[in-house]
């Protein structure tokens, strides 16, 4: 789950990272009052959960309360990358001498928690890495031992930090990692980290948490806004279905996250575009679970075919087949299915589906391998 900028800043401030003074407004009149309270010179920032707000016109400066009102009037109601702006953050303008970058992420290559920092801030870290790779500094550390002070000092010395900037950067890196571990975050980021005459401030803030850890952090779960979630993902979450909407036209259902991702990869290799990730989870003893998964995938109007890839150990293929039949009986529309059943009672499951297809006219294609299934699904999707 990604938090809004103003929510992330509240958490950062709670942990001792300085942030600009500001408040959230949902109307131009509110924005005007907040700007007056802050002295007139403010920045009005769209609060939506996508990047690129500035380039899309969602971040603008104002030099008076009246101008803040006019700017807010333009930003509120805007649609940026499919997200409608319902609120803005109005905060004091900063006199920035420099802009730095600092963030925490779990690096997928090293599989280690990693601090990334740079003297070049205000742009995407990927852009910095592409144009100025030497400007990016990384600290990999052992999650069992945590981030050691000497590791941070060594990295900052190598990057050329000294004096007061060294002290403040050290402090912010340590606090950013503390926040990440306290909230089980996948990402904590300050970009830009503003260097002002008064010290370092988080001019922008990001905090992405792990959805699977939210039950341990009810205070974060309460911040989730239904309007900012993909409707299909929200419905799946409420039903307990492990689903991610991807926007392609080949629906994917597999029993296991690894199998689902491998299926998606091969669909991509075959020139197709997966519509979703869906992991049914283990067991599938209850046919209703399979039924609900298939019906949910079919709610995406872009889906033209569904590839069902099942490897059955504890799972029994006849229960999977029963769930597919239940779904097809209820489905509001018909799409072709590509089905690969392997494992416990696969012959029984296949016979059930073949009989149903023959009697009801359902278009079900059976395959023997994941490659054959992906190829067939891409072909049917057109």
From Swiss-Prot:
Please give the biological process terms from Gene Ontology that the record holds: succinyl-CoA metabolic process; tricarboxylic acid cycle
Cofactor(s) of this protein: Mg(2+)
InterPro entries xrefs: ATP-grasp, ATP-grasp_succ-CoA_synth-type, ATP_grasp_subdomain_1, Succ-CoA_synthase_bsu_CS, SUCC_ACL_C, Succ_CoA_ligase-like_bsu, Succinyl-CoA_synth-like
Q: How is the cofactor bound?
A: Binds 1 Mg(2+) ion per subunit.
Q: Where does ATP bind?
A: 45, 52-54, 91, 94, 99
- Where do the ATP-grasp domain residues begin and end? 9-235
What does it catalyze? Answer: succinate + ATP + CoA = succinyl-CoA + ADP + phosphate; GTP + succinate + CoA = succinyl-CoA + GDP + phosphate
Q: Where is the signal peptide?
A: none
Q: Name one GO cellular component term.
A: succinate-CoA ligase complex
User: Which pathway does it operate in?
Assistant: Carbohydrate metabolism; tricarboxylic acid cycle; succinate from succinyl-CoA (ligase route): step 1/1
Positions that bind Mg(2+): 191, 204
Q: Which Pfam families match?
A: ATP-grasp_2 (PF08442), Ligase_CoA (PF00549)
Task: Work out whether the entry's keyword set contains Cell membrane.
Answer: no
Catalytic EC class:
ligase
This entry's Gene Ontology molecular function terms read: ATP binding; magnesium ion binding; succinate-CoA ligase (ADP-forming) activity; succinate-CoA ligase (GDP-forming) activity
The UniProt keyword set, sorted, is: ATP-binding, Ligase, Magnesium, Metal-binding, Nucleotide-binding, Tricarboxylic acid cycle
Q: Where does substrate bind?
A: 255
The record's EC number reads 6.2.1.5
Q: What does this protein do?
A: Succinyl-CoA synthetase functions in the citric acid cycle (TCA), coupling the hydrolysis of succinyl-CoA to the synthesis of either ATP or GTP and thus represents the only step of substrate-level phosphorylation in the TCA. The beta subunit provides nucleotide specificity of the enzyme and binds the substrate succinate, while the binding sites for coenzyme A and phosphate are found in the alpha subunit.
Q: How the protein assembles, per its UniProt entry?
A: Heterotetramer of two alpha and two beta subunits.
Q: Which family does it belong to?
A: Belongs to the succinate/malate CoA ligase beta subunit family.
Protein name, please? Succinate--CoA ligase [ADP-forming] subunit beta 1
Q: Which organism is it from?
A: Archaeoglobus fulgidus (strain ATCC 49558 / DSM 4304 / JCM 9628 / NBRC 100126 / VC-16)
Could you read off the lineage of the organism from its UniProt record? Archaea, Methanobacteriati, Methanobacteriota, Archaeoglobi, Archaeoglobales
Q: Which gene encodes it?
A: sucC1
């Amino acid at each position: 789950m990604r938090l809004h900028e103003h929510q992330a800043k509240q958490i950062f401030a709670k942990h001792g990272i300085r942030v600009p003074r500001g408040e959230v407004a949902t109307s131009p009149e509110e924005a005007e009052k907040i700007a007056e309270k802050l002295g007139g010179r403010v920045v009005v920032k769209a609060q939506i959960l996508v990047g690129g707000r500035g380039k899309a016109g969602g971040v603008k400066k104002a030099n008076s309360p009246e101008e803040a009102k006019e700017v807010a009037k333009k930003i509120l109601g805007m649609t940026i990358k499919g997200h409608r702006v319902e609120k803005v953050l109005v905060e004091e303008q900063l006199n920035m001498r420099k802009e730095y970058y600092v963030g925490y992420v779990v690096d997928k290559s090293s599989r280690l928690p990693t601090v990334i920092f740079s003297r070049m801030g205000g742009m995407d870290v990927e852009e910095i890495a592409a144009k100025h790779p030497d400007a990016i500094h990384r600290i990999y550390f052992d999650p069992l031992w945590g981030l050691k002070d000497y590791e941070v000092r060594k990295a900052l010395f190598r990057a050329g930090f000294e004096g007061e900037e060294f002290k403040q950067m050290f402090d912010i890196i340590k606090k950013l990692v503390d926040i990440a571990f306290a909230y089980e975050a996948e990402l904590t980021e300050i970009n830009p980290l503003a260097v002002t005459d008064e010290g370092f401030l988080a001019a922008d803030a990001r905090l992405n948490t792990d959805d699977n850890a939210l039950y341990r952090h009810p205070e974060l779960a309460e911040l989730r806004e239904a309007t900012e979630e993909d409707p299909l993902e929200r419905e799946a979450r409420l039903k307990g279905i492990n689903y991610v909407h991807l926007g392609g036209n080949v629906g994917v259902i597999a029993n296991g996250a690894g199998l689902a991702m491998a299926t998606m990869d091969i669909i991509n290799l075959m020139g197709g575009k997966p519509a979703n990730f869906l992991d049914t989870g283990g067991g599938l003893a209850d046919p209703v679970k399979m039924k609900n998964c298939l019906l949910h995938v079919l709610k995406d109007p872009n889906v033209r075919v569904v590839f069902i890839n099942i490897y059955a150990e504890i799972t029994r293929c006849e229960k999977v087949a029963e769930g597919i039949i239940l779904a097809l009986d209820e489905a509001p529309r018909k799409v072709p299915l590509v089905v690969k059943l392997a494992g416990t009672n696969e012959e029984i499951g296949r016979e059930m589906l073949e009989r149903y297809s023959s009697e009801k006219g359902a278009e079900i294609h059976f395959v023997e391998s994941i490659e054959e299934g992906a190829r067939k699904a891409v072909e049917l999707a057109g």
